[in-house]
Structures are given as C-alpha cells and as structure tokens.
Design a protein with these regions (language model features):
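Buried, small/hydrophobic-residue-enriched core segments of structured protein domains
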Residues: 1-30, 39-41, 77-78, 83-92, ...
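N-terminal, Lys/Arg-enriched amphipathic/low-complexity engagement segments
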Residues: 31-87
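Gly/Ser/Thr/Ala-enriched C-terminal appendages of enzymes
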Residues: 1-29, 33, 42-44, 279-281, ...
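Short coil/turn segments at secondary-structure boundaries
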Residues: 70-71, 139-143, 157, 453-460
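Short acidic, Pro/Gly- and aromatic-enriched capping/linker segments at domain boundaries
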Residues: 95-101, 414-417
Length: 481
C-alpha cells in the first residue's frame, strides 16, 4: 500500500532536536540500531512479525516538503543550515529485517538499521509505529485462528478499530495470520484481502417481517445466502424463518442455504439447538457462524468445554484492538557507533535485567533440527562470526555464562533471519504478495513447537548468545557498572 500522504514528519519531536545536535557535531558518523521487543503480548510464547511493507514505503519516500520545512522554521528551534540540510535529506543507509509473517521472539532484532546518525534517528518513530501495531494485531489474529482449529475466522473489527489506518492495516495482517477474510472493503481493494459480509439487524428491521427480509435477501443472493437469525428470537423465529425461506424458495430453485449467523445469546446452547433444527430439516450442509465479543479463550472454551456446534467465527474488537493486551512494546536501541572508522559496540544498562541490551552489530540465526525441521533456538552472533554446522554449537543464556546448551555437530542447520531490505539507500528487496506472506507465515509457524504456541504458560523459546557476544556483553557490563 503506497500511502498517498507524505508522512515524513510522523516522528517524535526529539528526533529533530537530537538531529540538530548531531548536525552541529558530526552528522556523517554511522550508527547501528536494533528494533526489538521485550515481552510477548497476552503472556504468549511468540509473535508474528508484520509491518515491513509499510516500513519500506516510509523509508523509500522519506523527504521533507517545503510546507514541512516552513512549519519547522516557524517553531524557532532550528538553524537555517539544519533546515536546508533537512530539505534535501534522503535515506542512504542499510536496513536488514526479518521477512513479514515470521514467528519471532523477545530480545532479537526484528529490524537492523545502519545509517548516518541523523537518518537512523529520524526513522525511529515510523518504524516502531508500523511494526508495533501490525505485529500486535497479527499475533492476536494468529492466536484466534489457532483456537478455531481449522474453522474459518473472519475479521469484523473495523468499527471498533482505533482509526482508519488501524482498521485497514489490521485487516491486512489478520489475513496474513490466517483469517479467512475481512469485512473491511478498503482492505480488499488495497491489498486483495477477501471481503466478507451479509446483513445487519437493521436490514431485517427495515422489512415488515423477518421472513420478508430473509426472502428478499435469498432472491438477491440465492447462491451465497447466509442469514442473521437473532434479531428477534434465534430459536422461536430466526432459525424457523431461515429454514422456511430455504424450503419455500432456495431449494425449489436449486440452491442451498449457505449459513446462518448468531450474534447474541449463549453461543454454545443456541448453536446446538440450531444445528439440531437444521439437521432435522435436511440441511446438514448449512453452516453456523457466530460473532459477539469472541477471542481465543472464548473460542477454545466453546469448542472444547461446551461442545458448541459452530463452523466459523466472526471476531471484531478483541482482534482489531488486541483488547486484552493492547500495546506491543517494540523499542529501538543503538547498539554500535562509528569512531575513527570503526564500529564501536554500545550497550544500554538498566537495573531491570530485561532492559539490558545486546551490544554490537549482530546476526540473527535460527537453529533448526536437521531431523525434524523444527526450530531449536534463535542465536545472536556478532557480525563477523561464522557457524560451522559440522561442529558442536554452544549457545548461552543472555546474562549467564553457566546457563548454556550444546547442540551436537551435524544435527542442526542454521538460517540467517535478517535479510537485506535497503543497501546504500536503495531498495534491494522484492516485496512478496499478500498471499505469499500468508503462505510463508503458515509454513514458518509449523516449525515452532506446540508447547511454545499454547495459550497458558507456554514453554519459553530460547533466544541465546554466542560465547563471543556474551563475553562482550559481560565485559561492557563490568566496565560501566
């Protein structure tokens, strides 16, 4: 999606105030930033990385127009030399990132930016905005799809989304994560997301009787007729009239009622009663769709604890807003800085252990079991390190030399997870289609053990360090503490 707006000023103001200081000091020195997160939302075991396409769009189009410069000048905080510099700035650095749709884990770089310091600083907010939102919604969507156990999940959340972009991009990543489609028509036009939807209660209320409404809809869409049956009474009128329309019009004309939707009441009880009535009417092929404040926990309970007879789910606010865990805590931290022609590692230290960063320019390697094809761990190494798969591989806990795991030689393979997106400011990555991202994501998620994907107390996936990187980190901690 090419955004028609120039969003270059979508940045925290301090990006600009810092950049003027850099401009006055040494605007050409290079830095490396890692974009990563510290904690999975919903206390989950993984996330689904998303938002890269919008990062590419922003970085490709980074520039300040005359109106932008005039506005900044009006603030009386920036020199004319700096404003002149901004008026011609373009991104000239390197960006590496994990492909969209990949399952990812805390404390590993999702995006690595190497660029002149001002350029690297200016893109911070937009990168975090794109990735934080879309990764959050992709992850929530995947959890809901997982809970449905093969039953279709439809994204119905636009009216509860936080704004237009949240609805449009939320539908995009919901589809990447496995939803069957979306009710958001714009996302269908812009991205090719399958669009879904039939009727609202207002449609039924606009007719003299529920039967009249159903009949009119059936005659208009005889080969795609799904009826909303809870406007007045699901069991006393809705399902009765739906069956009657099927028998009076659809079946005599060679059509079948595709489905009925329930949007209120006890989903388990009503679905079982409706299923029985449909089956007794010879309509075993008619699907039952439910909606109304669903999430992965409700869906899991409906299927496993309550024995609901449901074929597909329409999910709205709990998906599009990730209602239970509405913030994805991605951060953007400097890990290396050029000095005298060399990249010097940098570290951020905190009294909170989880906020201590991993220094230096790093590679992210996914270690795979050669026999099963399943992921064993993700390993951070310094850029110059090479992994020899014919040798034992020792991976270390990010803070403790005594906590380690040895993976025997010749039992594993290694994948480099960070791929080049921009080189010297030029886009070198062919953006995959939405269908390609969706298929890739499904394949990659299949390499993650179910124990890591469970909802309650998931097994922690290892994101470990090489010995060389761990030693560097501990040395820097000792130096600065």
């Amino acid at each position: 999606m090419k955004d028609k707006r120039n969003l270059s000023l979508v940045m925290d103001f301090y990006e600009l105030t810092m950049s003027q200081c850099y401009f006055n000091d040494n605007k050409d020195k290079e830095v490396v930033f890692d974009l990563f997160y510290r904690k999975n939302p919903d206390d989950g075991g993984y996330c689904v990385f998303a938002g890269l396409e919008q990062v590419v769009d922003y970085v490709s189009n980074l520039h300040f127009e005359k109106e932008d410069i005039d506005y900044l000048r009006s603030l009386n905080q920036f020199s004319e030399d700096f404003l002149e510099y901004l008026s011609t700035i373009r991104f000239t650095g390197d960006i590496y990132a994990i492909p969209e749709g990949t399952p990812v884990f805390p404390h590993e770089p999702l995006v690595r930016v190497k660029a002149p310091i001002i350029e690297a600083q200016l893109v911070e907010t937009a990168l975090l905005l794109a990735i934080n939102h879309q990764t959050l919604i992709a992850t929530k969507s995947r959890r809901i799809v997982q809970a449905s156990e093969g039953r279709a999940v439809m994204e119905f959340g636009a009216r509860r989304a936080h704004n237009f972009d949240a609805a449009i991009l939320g539908a995009r990543v919901a589809y990447i994560a496995g939803c069957a489609g979306s009710a958001t028509t714009y996302s269908g036009k812009e991205f090719g997301v399958p669009v879904l939807g039939t009727m609202a209660h207002s449609f039924i209320q606009s007719f003299d009787t529920e039967y009249d409404a159903f009949m009119y809809y059936a005659k208009t869409y005889p080969d795609a007729c799904t009826l909303l049956i809870d406007t007045y009474s699901t069991l006393k009128s809705g399902i009765v009239n739906a069956i009657k329309v099927a028998k009076d019009y659809l079946e005599p004309n060679g059509y079948r009622l595709k489905g009925v939707r329930i949007d209120s009441g006890d989903m388990a009880y009503l679905s079982k009663k409706v299923r029985k009535m449909l089956d007794e009417a010879g309509m075993k092929d008619c699907k039952i769709v439910v909606s109304n404040s669903l999430d992965e926990y409700v869906i899991e309970s409906l299927i496993h604890q309550q024995g609901a007879k449901i074929d597909s789910f329409g999910v709205g606010e709990n998906l599009i807003c990730s209602k239970n865990s509405p913030v994805f805590g991605g951060v953007y931290k400097m890990v290396a800085l050029e000095k005298d022609g060399h990249m010097i590692p940098k570290i951020k230290i905190s009294d909170n252990v989880e906020k201590v960063t991993n220094p230096g320019m790093k590679n992210l390697n996914r270690v795979m079991d050669k026999e099963t094809g399943m992921a064993i761990a993700d390993l951070l190494t310094l850029e110059d390190e090479v992994i020899d798969t014919t040798q034992d591989l020792t991976i270390y806990h990010p803070m403790s030399r005594w906590k380690y795991k040895v993976i025997p030689a010749n039992t594993y393979t290694v994948r480099d997870m960070l791929v080049p997106i921009f080189k010297d400011g030029k886009l070198v990555y062919d953006l995959p289609s939405l269908e390609e991202i969706r298929a890739y994501s499904e394949k990659e998620l299949a390499t993650i053990w179910d124990e890591i994907k469970r909802f309650v107390y998931p097994q922690e996936y290892y994101v470990d360090l090489s010995e060389k990187l761990l030693n560097l980190k501990l040395e820097m901690l000792k130096k600065y503490k």
